């Protein structure tokens, strides 16, 4: 109150100027207190001159000379001043906080302003803060989530904010519905389940067909023996046929050539490979593909 009574003429002049949409900050006379050092009528140099940043004190509060054309011009002047300070984080800087407190105090002292003028000043002040954050590399808009323990005052919500919330609410619900549907589709794929079910249902039929084919080819044991394993023992068989005596033919050899042969089991095939006998006629001294009995049973191919 003492401050306002001392600068009453200046305050009235400022009030009339603010009603016209402009803001003028005149040097105010303030009494020293114990908490903050006295604020002097220091004049900030011209905008083109860089301001040197020094230790924080009350003397660094800007007292701009001249009359800015409008509040927007004044805020642009303040922005240039704060950019010249080269502050890395303006939100935590003591000078910026002190300047904002000083500016808020000056605006509160002008309590005779109309409501519309105060709203315009507040809007320009918010724009100034956004421009200042952008100048330091911070984004203009940030998506923030309010804490759970913070209560929202519904009286401060503007109609525009309520309209934006109503427009975004269906989009959020639509996204949640799409994500839920995609998760359910990925969790249970009907086509994949049908394919697995068909394979399991056809498995007994496949086993039955394999058994029938095995019974059909029992009279042809050469089909049960893979010819791919034969070349592995070719060199050994020919080498032993030259350097070693030929084993005598067993007595039941002619009967084996005339009668039918039983299918070769895996155990018998392994034993024959160990003794290096013919897989078809169970005789030594020749290879399976050179067996005469096999050739005699194989039907002759017709020449085209």
Swiss-Prot record:
Alphabetical UniProt keywords: Metal-binding, Zinc, Zinc-finger
Domain of life of the native organism: Eukaryota
Disruption phenotype: Mutants are viable and don't show growth retardation in the pre- and postnatal periods in either female or male mice. Animals are fertile, even in the case of mating between mutants. They exhibit abnormal behaviors related to cognition, including attention, impulsivity, and working memory. Animals show a reduced recovery rate of noradrenaline in the prefrontal cortex region.
Tissue-specificity statement: In adults, expressed in brain, eye, kidney, ovary and testis. Weakly expressed in thymus, heart and muscle.
Keyword Lipid metabolism found: no
The keyword Zinc is assigned to this record: yes
InterPro entries with a match to the protein in the record: Znf_CCHC, Znf_CCHC_sf
GO biological process: cognition; norepinephrine metabolic process
CCHC-type zinc finger locations on the chain: 276-293
Known role: Involved in cognitive function in the brain, possibly via the noradrenergic system.
Name listed for the protein in its UniProt record: Retrotransposon Gag-like protein 4
Organism: Mus musculus (Mouse)
